[in-house]
Amino acid sequence: MQDKNNLCWLDMEMTGLNPETDRIIEVAMIITDSDLNVLAQSEVYAVHQSDELLDNMDEWNTATHGRTGLTQRVRESLHTEAEVEQKLLDFMSEWVPGRATPMCGNSIHQDRRFMVKYMPKLENYFHYRNLDVSTLKELAKRWNPSVAKSVVKRGSHKALDDILESIEEMRHYREHFLISAPRAEAQ
């Protein structure tokens, strides 16, 4: 049931921060309505990458993805980037028309950089705008520090957990930071 007002939340885990040398190793999506109610969630996809790439991750990524079990899941995965891209496009298109939803998440520009390089059809399905919870976090730190400090982050660095945390964080900022006004019907 497509709705142009639905929001698509996404998170990726990567082998590092440079899309020229690093790769996507995990990705998931959640669709919410405009009130941040979860409507659907995709599978969590571990994307197969070579042992060489995984063995050359920096210390932080090696420790973090090793601790969560992601490195082993990536080694065992049969999913390619192209296959995962198509599965996510199929999932997303059930809920949102093309170019309607901003890409939603935390520091989402980083995910978008990797998507441009490795999943360009998926990146193109999103609107060019981002709904980045990190922006609200930075504004709250400066304009209302108590609101920023009251956000509890677990930081599991698992794609689905991180999306759910981003949605919860957005709810927090909506309730405690953004000024409420009578809600008008979205155009």
From Swiss-Prot:
<dbReference type="GO" id="GO:0005737">
    <property type="term" value="C:cytoplasm"/>
</dbReference>
<keyword id="KW-0269">Exonuclease</keyword>
<dbReference type="InterPro" id="IPR013520">
    <property type="entry name" value="Exonuclease_RNaseT/DNA_pol3"/>
</dbReference>
<protein>
    <recommendedName>
        <fullName>Oligoribonuclease</fullName>
        <ecNumber>3.1.15.-</ecNumber>
    </recommendedName>
</protein>
<comment type="similarity">
    <text>Belongs to the oligoribonuclease family.</text>
</comment>
<comment type="function">
    <text>3'-to-5' exoribonuclease specific for small oligoribonucleotides.</text>
</comment>
<dbReference type="GO" id="GO:0003676">
    <property type="term" value="F:nucleic acid binding"/>
</dbReference>
<feature type="domain" description="Exonuclease">
    <location>
        <begin position="7"/>
        <end position="170"/>
    </location>
</feature>
<dbReference type="InterPro" id="IPR036397">
    <property type="entry name" value="RNaseH_sf"/>
</dbReference>
<dbReference type="InterPro" id="IPR012337">
    <property type="entry name" value="RNaseH-like_sf"/>
</dbReference>
<dbReference type="GO" id="GO:0000175">
    <property type="term" value="F:3'-5'-RNA exonuclease activity"/>
</dbReference>
<feature type="active site">
    <location>
        <position position="128"/>
    </location>
</feature>
<keyword id="KW-0963">Cytoplasm</keyword>
<dbReference type="GO" id="GO:0006259">
    <property type="term" value="P:DNA metabolic process"/>
</dbReference>
<keyword id="KW-0378">Hydrolase</keyword>
<dbReference type="InterPro" id="IPR022894">
    <property type="entry name" value="Oligoribonuclease"/>
</dbReference>
<dbReference type="Pfam" id="PF00929">
    <property type="entry name" value="RNase_T"/>
</dbReference>
<keyword id="KW-0540">Nuclease</keyword>
